[in-house]
């Protein structure tokens, strides 16, 4: 099984490229954002706790995310690969993830770091907010989310670089152009793991 992390700032195209990987390889997609939005919509205890953080542009605390992911990961055994989108977002989450995966005899194989200029991220997020109606896609919250990313999540680049699994990918261009930059990376690791 191949474990792939899609990494990048809000608006970098993580969800879109995850969909491309699912289509191309049949991987299972785990998006913490989608899981949290579902919890919020269902008004679960986790959803109510997470909503306050998300609406303010803050990261949901590690303990809530790790518990949610641990439950989900334990159900995924017969799959070609897993795409983690939005997890981990902090060093403690990354360390917890390594422990969770190791418990199943797995590891992080590839980290795809989608790199997009900030002005393009803002434009993409504002457009997405108009289309989707997501309340967290307004300029004030976007800037706060980008600051949180720079301060709390970007340090993971160094963390995964030291583990020799990080691959920087230019995240500009068409969806297909970006997917074509990612495919050779994934193909190389699929050959090694088969």
From Swiss-Prot:
Q: Which domain of life is it from?
A: Bacteria
Residues that hold ATP according to the record: 11-16, 128, 173
InterPro entries from the entry? Answer: Adenylat/UMP-CMP_kin (IPR000850), Adenylat_kinase_CS (IPR033690), P-loop_NTPase (IPR027417)
Q: Where is this region: LID?
A: 127-137
Q: Is the keyword Protease assigned to this protein?
A: no
| UniProt keyword DNA damage present | no
Q: Which cellular component, as a GO term, is one annotated location?
A: cytoplasm
Which Enzyme Commission numbers does its entry carry?
A: 2.7.4.3
Taking the record's annotation, the residue ranges forming a coiled coil are none
Name its GO BP terms in alphabetical order.
AMP salvage
UniProt keyword list: ATP-binding, Cytoplasm, Kinase, Nucleotide biosynthesis, Nucleotide-binding, Transferase
Task: Give, as in the UniProt entry, the pathway in which the protein acts.
Answer: Purine metabolism; AMP biosynthesis via salvage pathway; AMP from ADP: step 1/1
Catalyzed reactions per annotation: AMP + ATP = 2 ADP
Q: Which Gene3D superfamilies does this entry report, sorted A to Z?
A: P-loop containing nucleotide triphosphate hydrolases (3.40.50.300)
What Pfam family is a match for this entry? ADK
Q: Name the major location.
A: cytoplasm
The record's annotation in PROSITE patterns points to: ADENYLATE_KINASE
Q: How does it assemble?
A: Monomer.
UniProt xrefs under NCBIfam families: PRK00279.1-3, PRK14527.1, PRK14531.1, PRK14532.1
Say what the protein does: Catalyzes the reversible transfer of the terminal phosphate group between ATP and AMP. Plays an important role in cellular energy homeostasis and in adenine nucleotide metabolism.
Give the family per the record: Belongs to the adenylate kinase family.
The molecule here is called Adenylate kinase
Gene encoding it? adk
């Amino acid at each position: 099984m191949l474990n792939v992390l899609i990494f990048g700032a809000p608006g970098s195209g993580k969800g879109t490229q995850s969909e491309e990987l699912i289509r191309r390889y049949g991987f299972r997609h785990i998006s913490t954002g989608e899981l949290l939005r579902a919890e919020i919509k269902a008004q679960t205890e986790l959803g109510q706790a997470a909503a306050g953080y998300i609406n303010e542009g803050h990261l949901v605390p590690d303990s809530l995310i790790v518990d949610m992911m641990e439950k989900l990961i334990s159900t995924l055994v017969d799959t070609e690969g897993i795409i983690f989108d939005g997890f981990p977002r902090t060093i403690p989450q990354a360390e917890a993830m390594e422990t969770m995966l190791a418990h199943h005899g797995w590891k992080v194989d590839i980290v795809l770091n989608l790199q997009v200029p900030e002005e393009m991220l803002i434009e993409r997020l504002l457009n997405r907010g108009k289309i989707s109606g997501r309340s967290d896609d307004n300029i004030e919250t976007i800037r706060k989310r980008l600051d949180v990313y720079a301060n709390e999540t970007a340090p993971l680049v160094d963390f995964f670089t030291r583990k020799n699994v990080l691959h920087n990918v230019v995240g500009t261009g068409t969806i297909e152009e970006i997917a074509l930059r990612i495919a050779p990376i994934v193909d190389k690791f699929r050959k090694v793991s088969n």
